[in-house]
Amino acid sequence: MGPTISIGEALDRYDIDNARYAGSLQTDISAWLRLRNDDSQIIILHPDHRPPVKYEQDIFETESLVPAMNAARGVKDSYEIELIRKANIVSGLAHTAVLEKIGQMTNESDIAGLFLETCMTHGAPEQAYGIIAASGENGATLHYMKNNEDFGSRLSVCLDAGAEYECYASDVTRTFPISSTGEWPTTEARDIYLAVERMQEECIRMIKPGVRFRDVHIHASVVAVEELLKLGVFKEGNSVDEIMASGAVSVFFPHGLGHHVGLEVHDVSEQSVMAATDDMSPRMRARGFLMQPASMMSAALLEANMIVTVEPGIYFNRLALKNARTLPIARFIDFDVVERYYAIGGVRIEDDILVTTDGYENLTTAPKGDAALAIIRKSSVKNSRS
């Protein structure tokens, strides 16, 4: 378990007003009982936090603290924003380090190891979540975390990894070619990346106070349908509206557009932007991008100083597409065309976006798109000369 931290260390680490050792709890409560008003209660977070001591009266209130804390955590103060900004800076350095070395790497573990090492050397020894370094078709598995397969002839990597800094998370995903030339190895890989890039860029531009995040998610889905129609994945002759109404887009974009970021990578709030249930511990929840979209009326509105991810993706998951063949939505999908895209696995691009009073600020500094490809090319030339 390691050494017990001191009270001073606890005050500094958790930015709290008071801290006591657990051994003094019974004495402290007994002293409080002698002085309290008859209607006073001790407010605790969960029923299972009750001290293992019986009292004559029920002095513990367990209902009000969780929603109050959730509401407070949804909107960040300037101190929290700067810590999340710092976490993103460290993550950006780690993502850049991977891009600089990808041409020399041969296994997913090389990526995960370098990412973690870079974060640790820049003051962030903890990851906000388990690193996902998914090469080739592994990129179609949202929670792929084996990180141990050789690249072989695979086309690309979906790297979902973010540092934690002073208890605050970042959440960053980049997809890039496994290449020493900095070029997409196939037209199909490039086209899917550009489609997701368009999804993300248009959605980020929509972020501002008063916007219903569910509407931004719907826009991402519409763009995905438009792009997949252009590529022939959805059959010509079907309209965007028809495909959207059928739900067929969920085969390729099966998750929500984003979630809050804060003390947890999928942070709590008064009302989750994608209708996740906030009555369970964040550690016990599915990852944010797996939460089911809310109904139009229940989805939350964005407020200034919220920080949310914008993480669209397009995936070619063999199991999902095999199942789709048995469903009514199969009539919209050209499965012969789909065969050309399986090798891509999945493409996801994810940034952490601060909602400002009049728009947004992108806190994520990790290179993406053309900037990422340029780093791969430059590093390849440099490494060939050394």
Curated annotation (Swiss-Prot):
It comes from the Eukaryota. It comes from Talaromyces marneffei (strain ATCC 18224 / CBS 334.59 / QM 7333) (Penicillium marneffei). Mn(2+) 1 binds at D171, E311, E350. This is Probable Xaa-Pro aminopeptidase PMAA_074180. Catalyzes the removal of a penultimate prolyl residue from the N-termini of peptides. The keyword Ubl conjugation does not apply. Keywords: Aminopeptidase, Hydrolase, Manganese, Metal-binding, Metalloprotease, Protease. CDD domains: Prolidase. GO terms for biological process: proteolysis. It catalyses: Release of any N-terminal amino acid, including proline, that is linked to proline, even from a dipeptide or tripeptide. Its cofactor is Mn(2+). GO terms for molecular function: aminopeptidase activity; metal ion binding; metallopeptidase activity. Coiled coil: none annotated. Belongs to the peptidase M24B family.
